[in-house]
Amino acid sequence: MDSLVVSNIRQRPLRSAISIIGVALGVALVMLFTGLAHGMSDDLQKRSSNVTAEIIFTRPGSMGLTTSSANLSTKYAELLKEVEGVESTTPVIRYFYPSGSFGVDQVEGIEWDSFSKMNNIRLIQGHAPVADDEIVIDETKAARNHPVGSSLKVFGPKLYRVAGIYAPESGARAKMSIGSLQRALESPDKCTFIFVKVKNPSDQVAVARRIDAKFPGNKIQFTREVFASIENSIPGLNIFLRVLVVLILLCSGQCSILNRSARLVHRRDWINFAMSRSH
């Protein structure tokens, strides 16, 4: 069997090379796109897991993995503190915007003092965002040639100045003051969701029930459940990967079929030529 394979490669080196390249290209593309998709979801999950709040309080339908809206009143941040078992709260606006030709990026509007204290993040350079044109970014984004004092286009044509760099990475890589993002989105006193930190993490279920009883009609999620299933929550990711694998395998198979068809046509032409010469 081995000698048959070797002899076939020696007799038809071009056809064999094309077949090998076609299969190798298909396998490489499957590995590339699958790795990119899983890498992006793993990165998002890692950044989200650095959030230490136990509960997310929001409006139904206001927050998805790639879409969000600011329709929750920030007044809830103070009202939630009155619930038994709640230690602290902080409102957040999460805004998604086009990045590059096909990508999507996000920016968060936060109250720096309450957000950084709750999630144990600190400034390693610069200062917190104060002015409407100031943002802070994490170390990963800063490493992409965005030092403190540089300008960065976050969304729209407006440039924002990098006021500081924070660590560890948590949520969106770029953050601005919640007031600045409210004015940019024309959504005064609104946010996308509110992080709720409970006094005793083991009581988070009971605290969530108290919140639901006091503020019915809103949506309450546990961060441990939201961030643990990020990959499964990405709309159509698994379907996209399956379709991608099938398409690439079909293309690789088609290359082999076309290669063989070309050889058969070439052989037929030689046979016809030989027969015509014999007559």
Q: Where are each of the predicted segments found?
A:
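Short amphipathic alpha-helical coupling elements at transmembrane boundaries
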Residues: 4-11, 42-49, 53, 216, ...
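A short beta-strand structural signal in non-transmembrane regions
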Residues: 55-59, 141-142, 163-168, 188-214, ...
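Structured catalytic cores of enzymes that bind and process phosphorylated ligands/cofactors
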Residues: 23, 41, 112-119, 129, ...
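N-terminal Sec/SRP start-transfer signal
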Residues: 1-28, 41, 231, 264
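Hydrophobic secondary-structure segments that place a key small or acidic residue at a functional site
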Residues: 92-93, 101-111, 119-180, 190
